[in-house]
């Protein structure tokens, strides 16, 4: 992976399971991505309204 480009990529993780959310966040942060998380759709929608993310990882089974 080209880690120089990863520095500038911002990713939003939307996951209600804390252990999975933390694992994804730590893994991506280790690769030098800027990572934000949300555990509800509402929280994610507020973050999306304020910032344009390069990638959103969304739990499709979110309650």
Question: What kind of region is each of these model predictions?
Answer:
Residues 32-35:
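A generic structural motif
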Residues 15:
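Conserved acidic carboxylate
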Residues 37-55:
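Acidic, metal-coordinating helix/loop segments flanking the phosphotransfer/catalytic sites
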Residues 59:
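Active-site residues of response regulator receiver
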């Amino acid at each position: 992976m080209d880690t120089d480009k990863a520095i500038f990529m911002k990713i939003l993780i939307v996951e209600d399971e804390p252990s999975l959310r933390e694992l994804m966040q730590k893994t991506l942060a280790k690769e030098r991505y800027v990572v934000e998380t949300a555990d509800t759709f509402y929280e994610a929608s507020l973050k999306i309204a304020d910032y344009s993310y390069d990638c959103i990882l969304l739990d499709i089974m979110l309650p």
